[in-house]
Amino acid sequence: MLTAATNAASSCSGLLIPPSNALITYSLASGGTSVAALFMAGYIPGIIWALCCCVVGVLLAVKLGYKGTPGKFDWKNLGVCTLRALPSLSLIIVVIGGVFSATEGSAIAVVYALVLAFCYRSINLKSLWKIIVDSAKMSGMVVFLVGVSNILGWVMAFLQIPDAVAAALLSLTSNKYIILLIMNVILLVSGTFMDVTPAILIFTPLFLPICQSFGMSTIQFGLILVYNLCIGNITPPVGNALFVGIKVGRTSLSKVMPYMLMYYVAIIGGLLLVTFIPAVSTALPQAMGLM
């Protein structure tokens, strides 16, 4: 259960750290915000997310009484293990090396992983069919969840719900901190049942002008938006990453959620840093001359 929760919670940091399709989508939705600046801005929030997961993971491991490998650290053993792991680690280069598109890289990575599995003798022809069936079930689950979230996004846009929400938000208060808190709540809730891409396309033109009216940069808002939607990606009822983690871990939502609650608290703490400290998302782009 802890493994499934840890994998699910940490997985979405990849949407913040380049290369990120979510940030590219936001660049288009916001009218051409610099992709290079967004990529550079994503590093610190992504690292904050990862550190939050590290802290919670250590605390949970200590609480559950997990112990490290017995014996002292051995550099020679590290080298041997690294060499043995190189074929598997090369899979990362295949996926994010930039040689293929995201879709092509995924397909090639599957073939590469399949060949490695046979080489390591971790699977055989008899077990291959079961693996294919399980993969088909998991893919079907993800496609269904994405389809439902896209339908909900279309319904919200058709009924002009986001416009009504934005108008109500401005009528409540002119305090930018309260507006940001309410905006975060709206994005967090919406992210739990909407896919990242339609949510970015719907909420960027609504909330970006509001944030710009009190001096927030398009870079900071983009990171706030994507960070919120990343949290939604690991939160029921849709939570694509969460349910994939549960499926891979062969566990259930009821068993994983007690661990996920601690991750939510830590990650939302990171969200507050991104929201109320502009330097978290703007320091690196400014230092690199991208803003």
Region locations from a protein language model:
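Alpha-helical transmembrane segments of multi-pass membrane transport proteins
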Residues: 1-291
